[in-house]
Amino acid sequence: MINYVTAGESHGPQLTGVLTGIPAGLQLDIDAINTGLAARQGGFGRGNRQQIEHDTVQIIGGVRHGVTLGSPIALTIMNRDHAHWAAIMDPVSPATATNTLRQVTRPRPGHADLVGGMKYGHRDLRNVLERSSARETAMRVAIGQICKQLLAQLDIHLVGYVQQIGPKQVTADLTLSVDQLQAQIAQNDLRLPDAALVPEIHELITATKKAGDTLGGVIRVVAENVPAGLGSYTNWDTKLDGQLAAAVMGVNAMKGVEIGDGFAAASHYGSQVMDEISWDEHAGWSRLTNHLGGFEGGMTNGMPIVVKAAMKPIPTLYKPLQSVDIATKVSQKASVERSDTTAIVPASIVVESVVAIELTRALTATFDGSNLARLQQTVTAYREELRQY
């Protein structure tokens, strides 16, 4: 079963990740990983840091000649902006009057600053914000891209896209395949499946930036061809939809998760929500609709998995809100760090990545994942077993 850990601060020397449980024999496409990292840096409404960073991953363990070994995979992503913060973010040199000049003592409402400082005893809130920054998600995207490549070898494909930015909702054809969605969102810089609203949303983001404010939005992820039976109804913590919800909520700024119709299902009758069952001699078992987003009883049911995430607006405001200085206890405006007007576009890449990670975790927990060929054979045999059930 796969697991991972990340380390590193936003303006530290680098981000580091260790991914365990990936089968041996997977031919990694490094360019594809870097393409995912570049997509995370894109999108209308990003801040100036994206002009500094040009993220590329370096594999330093667990891969030989481009092929995974089955051992832990170690990855790094350099922080180019560290050159401007080398003294302030030096991991080793003792603190001095010079390298502590940019202390943060005015916590930002909505950020981890104040509570993180209280919990860990930090008087310089930079010690909190450097790790709680969404910069860390670059490594989760790199790890998620590896998982996506493994899923593709099992003919499982997924995509994350933007469904809403601020008050602007996009009406999309929910029956589109992953390939069709990918083709549509590639046509604009907001990852929208319908480009009609792009000019209007550009104007909204520009006006919001001028006002010193920020915007959130809604992300939708669709995964196709996931076999039925991943996860389990037998205990609360083995339900895969619960694990997906936890992973999505673990992404910075996410405040809500829906599976399938989610909260909308609560306002309908059961006869309108439950997905009727069908069977075909060739295709096997299916559902006539997909209101439940590919899950029943905490298990995948073979239909496309649909996960939606609500992202709050970024808490760093260029027109800062009221706060209190933790050193003087005097009421002041919150501190300002370089930030984005909206990060909903990169967040869609991050949420897509963590969904890929959790699906890979479930697959490698269910089937022998020692090497890719065996995993493919086992999953293929399992699919046939389900078809004949």
Swiss-Prot record:
Pathway: Metabolic intermediate biosynthesis; chorismate biosynthesis; chorismate from D-erythrose 4-phosphate and phosphoenolpyruvate: step 7/7. Its cofactor is FMNH2. This is Chorismate synthase. PROSITE patterns: CHORISMATE_SYNTHASE_1. Transmembrane segments: none annotated. Homotetramer. Reduced FMN (FMNH(2)). GO terms for biological process: amino acid biosynthetic process; aromatic amino acid family biosynthetic process; chorismate biosynthetic process. Keywords: Amino-acid biosynthesis, Aromatic amino acid biosynthesis, FAD, Flavoprotein, FMN, Lyase, NADP. SUPFAM superfamilies: Chorismate synthase, AroC. The lineage of its organism: Bacteria, Bacillati, Bacillota, Bacilli, Lactobacillales. It comes from the Bacteria. NCBIfam families: aroC, PRK05382.1. GO terms for cellular component: cytosol. Its EC number is 4.2.3.5. NADP(+) binds at R40, R46. GO terms for molecular function: chorismate synthase activity; FMN binding. Belongs to the chorismate synthase family. This reaction introduces a second double bond into the aromatic ring system. The gene is aroC.
